[in-house]
């Protein structure tokens, strides 16, 4: 289906636009559809994005942007002052604050921009000139919510797909890796992201090991385990506990990871950045949900599904869970339940429909 901007003529003229989003890699990746909508509505404008060092990697080589401005995560007063001077020199006419936290609100207010747009959160609402209700009558996908922020500009966008491009060189790197491990295009290739730094989003490692074996033994799948900075030892332990010898990917950057996921048939994982990268590459996904709300983090299309224990306390949106529950939402979610959810995704995985299990 072709997606279009419903209102191509923006209500506000702006030749210089700044978008602000801090925090995690996934937060910035899920903001890229906003850039697509802005570039469609403002094809000749100068568009910049203000973020932090780690998530800023998502925006490398993004063709929709003219500039990526990096704010150090723990900026000193001098660095804050230098950043503000740089922003004011750019003479932005429109600032869109997607995160709306105290730091971004102050920067937006002091940017010198005439038009300052954000979600309404009192008292920070006082720093902006245009506000959109923060709460929606029904739960909504995070990307849809951020696109809703553009409606005061007369922009109504419907394309929810995140953007993470990769080069031919990165594609060649992935192809060489797959050849080295004798993974052929005919095989069912499943990428699993088995880690999360927040305990209430982390399915037990032993469960992942058992799932890897089940995928190999019952479906004949080739399984690759994904990992990021500080996660290698944890993922190595998961691989060592599996009988089927899953392969760990190398220490790749985000764009090479995107090139890999573009070649995969299916993604399984926790609610973290690799999920959103998989979505950006158009492959079906299954997300193991603990404390978070699946509606907020999954696209509405049926090929992106969640599996959860469905306890009364879900979703609690908490980062920790002590007695008496002790993260029961993840502990009690069985490997068989998750495998059944994988099988339910067969309508969107062509190879899963025709491959016979191999033991």
Language-model segments: residues:
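Catalytic machinery of carbohydrate-active enzymes
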Residues: 1-359
């Amino acid at each position: 289906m072709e997606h279009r901007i419903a209102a191509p003529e923006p209500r506000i003229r702006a030749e210089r636009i700044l978008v602000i989003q801090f925090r995690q890699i996934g937060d910035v990746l899920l903001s890229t559809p906003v850039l697509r909508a802005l570039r469609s509505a403002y094809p000749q404008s100068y568009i910049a994005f203000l973020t932090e060092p780690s998530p800023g990697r998502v925006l490398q080589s993004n063709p929709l942007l003219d500039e990526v401005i990096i704010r150090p995560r723990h900026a000193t007063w001098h660095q804050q002052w230098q950043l503000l001077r740089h922003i004011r020199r750019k003479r932005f006419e429109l600032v869109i604050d997607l995160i709306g936290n105290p730091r971004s609100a102050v920067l937006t207010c002091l940017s010198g921009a005439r038009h300052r747009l954000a979600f309404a959160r009192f008292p920070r609402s006082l720093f902006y000139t245009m506000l959109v209700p923060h709460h929606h009558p029904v739960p909504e996908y995070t990307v849809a919510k951020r696109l809703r922020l553009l409606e005061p500009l007369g922009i109504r966008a419907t394309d929810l797909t995140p953007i993470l491009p990769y080069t031919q060189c990165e594609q060649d790197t992935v192809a060489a890796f797959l050849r080295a491990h004798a993974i052929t295009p005919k095989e069912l290739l499943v990428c699993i992201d088995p880690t999360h730094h927040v305990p209430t989003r982390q399915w037990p490692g032993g469960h992942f090991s058992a799932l890897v074996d089940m995928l190999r033994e019952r479906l004949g799948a080739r399984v690759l385990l994904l990992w990021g900075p500080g996660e290698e030892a944890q993922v190595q332990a998961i691989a060592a506990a599996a009988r089927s010898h899953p392969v760990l990917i190398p220490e790749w950057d985000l764009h090479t990871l995107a090139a890999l996921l573009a070649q995969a048939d299916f993604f399984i994982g926790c609610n973290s950045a690799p999920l959103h990268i998989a979505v950006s590459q158009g492959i079906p996904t299954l997300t193991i949900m603990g404390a978070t709300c699946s509606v907020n983090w999954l696209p509405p299309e049926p090929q992106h599904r969640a599996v959860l224990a469905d306890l009364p306390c879900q979703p609690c949106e908490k980062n920790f869970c002590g007695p008496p529950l002790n993260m029961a939402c993840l502990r009690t979610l069985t490997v068989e339940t998750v495998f059944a959810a994988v099988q339910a995704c067969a309508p969107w995985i062509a190879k899963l429909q025709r491959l016979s299990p191999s033991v």
